[in-house]
Amino acid sequence: MVSFGGIARKLFGSSNDRRVRSFQPNVTAINSIEEKTKALTDEQLAAKTAEFRALLAEGKTLDDILIPAFAVVREASRRVLDLRPFDVQLIGGMILHSNAIAEMKTGEGKTLVATLPVYLNALSGKGVHVVTVNDYLAQRDAATMGRVYGFLGMTTGVIVHGLSDEERRAAYACDITYATNNELGFDYLRDNMKYEKNQMVQRGHNFAIVDEVDSILVDEARTPLIISGPLDDRSELYNTIDAFIPLLVPSDYEIDEKQRSANFSEEGTEKLENMLRQAGLLKGNALYDIENVAIVHHINNALKAHKLFQRDKDYIVRNGEVVIIDEFTGRMMPGRRYSEGQHQALEAKEKVQIQPENQTLASITFQNYFRMYDKLAGMTGTAQTEAEEFGNIYNLDVIEVPTNLPIKRIDEDDEVYRTFDEKFKAIIEEILDAHKRGQPVLVGTTSIEKSELLAERLRKQGFNDFQVLNARYHEQEAYIVAQAGVPGAVTIATNMAGRGTDIQLGGNLEMRIERELGEIEAGPEREARIQAIVEEIKELKQKALTAGGLYVIATERHESRRIDNQLRGRSGRQGDPGRSKFYLSLQDDLMRIFGSDRMDSMLTKLGLKEGEAIVHPWINKALERAQKKVEARNFDIRKNLLKYDDVLNDQRKVIFEQRLELMESTNISETVSDMRREVIEDLVEKHIPERAYAEQWDAVGLKTGVTNILNLDLPIEDWFKEEGIGEDDIRERLTEAANAAFTEKAERFGDDIMHYVERSIVMQTLDHLWREHIVNLDHLRSVIGFRGYAQRDPLQEYKSEAFELFTGLLNNLREAVTAQLMRVELVQQAPAEPEPPLMQAHHLDPMTGEDDFAPIYQASEVIVAPENRNPEDPTTWGKIGRNEACPCGSGKKYKHCHGAFEQV
C-alpha cells in the first residue's frame, strides 16, 4: 500500500528534487552563454579571471558572477582536458558553492565538478582548500585539474607528507591548494607551536571542499590529530600487567562487543587486587582508590588487548611490530599507533618490543578543525544515511545529484545461511559461475582473515585465477583495482571504501599506458601501441557488458549501511549494467550481536536444510533496522564526544589566539606588567585575608612568596609592625619595589633585548603549561564518567572542573612568567631561538579508546642492501630510488613498476 508521504512525493517531488530544480535556472543561463564563451580566444578566456576579480573589487558578490564563471570553467575544461561538464555536474558545482554536500555516485566525475566552485571561490584571493584522503589523490587531482586553473591564470599548490615549511608556505599561498585532511590538521597544530608569525605556513581557513566527506567528517570525526613527544620507558610495567590477564576466567570480566568495552566483575577485581598487591603495584587497600588511577588504566588496556582486539582483524604483527588495520578500508597503517597505552598493551600481548609512550603536545579533532572554515562543502557517493549528523554538527545539507545516465545495477535481496561454511560454499559457487560467463567479480570482505580464508577455499577448488586486495598487499592495489573490470576477473577486496581508483569495465586505460609503455618515448611507436590498447579495452568492455557488467558479492554486512552502499556503488558506474548481492550467515558479527540465536531456532523449526538460504525483503529490512541502531548509537557517541571536545576546543582557541597576538607583538611590556600586578594582588590576598586583624596576617608566608616569585628581599615583618598600615599600603609598596627592580633590569638589557626576552619567556611558559593542561584534561576525562553513579551529570562536572583547571593554568602562567622575568639575567651571547620539542604526529580514535597514530613515514625511509631484499615481499625493500631497477625482477625502472602505484 502506498503511504500518504509516497503519494505526496509523487505529486510534488521530494525535498531533494525541489532543491535540485532550484538550480535549473542557473544551468539554463550557463548553457545560453556557452556558444558566446566558446567563441573567445584562449587569451580572452584566460583574461576573464582578471575581469571577475575587478567586478568583486567593485562590490559584486560571488553569486553575482557565478553564471559567467561556471561557463568559463566549463569551456576551459573542454579545451584543456577535453572534458565538458554535464548539466548535472554544473548542479553539483552549485551545491558545493552553496555550503552543502553533493552526493554523486561513483564515476559521475566529482573531481571535475569541484573545479567549478573552486575557481569561483578562489577569485576572492583568500584561498581554497580541496581536501582528499591520501597523498596520491592530492597529487593526481592537483596535477590534472591544475592545468585548468593554470590556463585561467590561477596558481595551484599541493601539500603532501615530507615537504619543508617553505614548500608548504608556498603551496598555501596559491589560489588553490590540494591537501589531505591529516596534513591540513597537522599544519594547523604545528603553526600554533611556532614562535614567529613568519614561520607559520597556513594563511587562514576560507573555503574547503572535502572529497569523500563521509569518510573524513564521520568515520574519522572521533579521531583527534595529535602532536606528541616521548615519555619515559614503562615496558616492564606493561609486561607485568599483561601476565595477569591469562590467569582470569570469563566470570572475572564482562565484554560488550556493541560498545567495544571491557570491565572487571567483583570477583575479577578481587583477584587483580591480590595479584597487584603481591607484585607491589597496589597503593592503599582498593584498586579503584584515586591513587591507583594509572594502574586501573593499564589493566583495562590489557583486558581490551586480549578480549576485544583480534589479530588479523584489528591489527597484524609484521617484522616484530603491531600494525593497525583500518576498520573501514582494511588497509595497514604502518607507523600509526593506538594511544593512551593501548598499543603498548597489544605489544605486550604479542610479546614484541614495547615502544615508548608519548605525551600529547597539541591536538584537534576533524570536527573542530573543519568547523573553523568560513565556508565548507563536501562530495561523496554515500552521504544520505548520515544526513542528520552532517546537519546537526556541521550545518551541512546533503543534496543528491541525479546521475547523468540512469543506474542499471540490480541490487538483489540478501541470502542468509545458517552457518559460515554454508555461506562460503554458496559464494564460491557463485564466483565460479560468474567467472565462466566472463563476468568480472568483486568480492568484498570485512577483514584480512576472511579475504584470505576465501582465497584459500578457492584454491582448494582448483581455482587460482583471482587477485587479493587487502592490507598485506596494498603495494599493488591501484593496478589490481584498475583491472578488476576485465571480463572474468575475480578480485577479493577488504572493504573497498576509499580506494581512490575507479573500476572501469574492460580495464583502466591510463594505468595500462603507464605500466606497459612507461619506457617508450613519445613518437609513432608509442601512439600505435596506445591505439592498440584503446581497441583492446573497447573489446574487453563489450565482453564485460555482455556478461552483465561488474558483479559485486559482499560476504558480510558492515555495521554501517554507508560502507555497504560504497561497495555496491562500485558496480553500475556511468549507466553500465551491474549486479550486487550480500551473502550472510547467522554467525556473522552483525547477526550474532543482534540476536541470531532466536533466528537460528526459528529457521530450524521452519525446516531450513543445510545449504539452503532464506531470501526475503523482510530479512533486508530487519538487517537495515539493526544497522540503523548501530549508526544511531555511533552518532550519539560522536555527538557526546563533541560536547566534551568543545570544552577543550574553546580553551584551545583562547590559547592559540593569545599565542598569535604574542607573535604579532613586538612589545608586550604592558601585558607583563599586568601579570606582575595580578601576582602581587594574589600574594596579598592569600596572606592578608579580607577583614582579618593585623595579628592574623601571615608575614612569613608573604615574605617567602615575595622572595620566591618576585626575587626581592623586603622587610615585610617590619612593615607589618607599623602603626595603622593596611593591605593597600603593603600592595603599593610591593608593586613599587617590583616595578623598580624590573625597570632597572630593563634599562641594563636595553628595550629591544628586554622585549625579546619577555615575549620568549611568556610563549615558552604558555606552551609548557598548555601541554600539562592537556594531560590533566585527559586524566579528568578518563574518570569523569564515574560521577554518573553519584547522580551527577558527567558533562557538567567536566565543564566545571575543566574551567577550574583553565583558571589555574592562567594563574600559574602569571606566576611563572613573573618569577622567571624577575630572575632573568643577560648573558654575553643573545638567547637562542626556542626550539620546538621533539614531535611525532598521531591520529587518535577515541570512540573505541583506540588511536590512529601517524608518523606514517618511517618504514619507507630505511635503505636496505639489495641482497637483503626479497623480490616477492615489497615490505623488505626499504627506500628505493625512482630510477633504480625494480627489486621484483621485472627489469623495469622502479618508477614504472611497483613505484608507479606505491602511494595509492
Curated annotation (Swiss-Prot):
GO terms for cellular component: cell envelope Sec protein transport complex; cytosol; plasma membrane. It catalyses: ATP + H2O + cellular proteinSide 1 = ADP + phosphate + cellular proteinSide 2. InterPro entries: Helicase_ATP-bd (IPR014001), P-loop_NTPase (IPR027417), SEC_C_motif (IPR004027), SecA (IPR000185), SecA_CS (IPR020937), SecA_DEAD (IPR011115), SecA_motor_DEAD (IPR014018), SecA_preprotein_X-link_dom (IPR011130). SMART domains: SecA_DEAD, SecA_PP_bind. Disulfide bonds: none annotated. ATP binds at Q89, G107, E108, G109, K110, T111, D502. The keyword Metal-binding applies. It is found in: Cell inner membrane; Cytoplasm. Its main location: membrane. Its cofactor is Zn(2+). GO terms for molecular function: ATP binding; metal ion binding; protein-exporting ATPase activity. One of its GO terms (biological process) is protein transport by the Sec complex. Part of the Sec protein translocase complex. Interacts with the SecYEG preprotein conducting channel. Has a central role in coupling the hydrolysis of ATP to the transfer of proteins into and across the cell membrane, serving both as a receptor for the preprotein-SecB complex and as an ATP-driven molecular motor driving the stepwise translocation of polypeptide chains across the membrane. Belongs to the SecA family. This is Protein translocase subunit SecA.
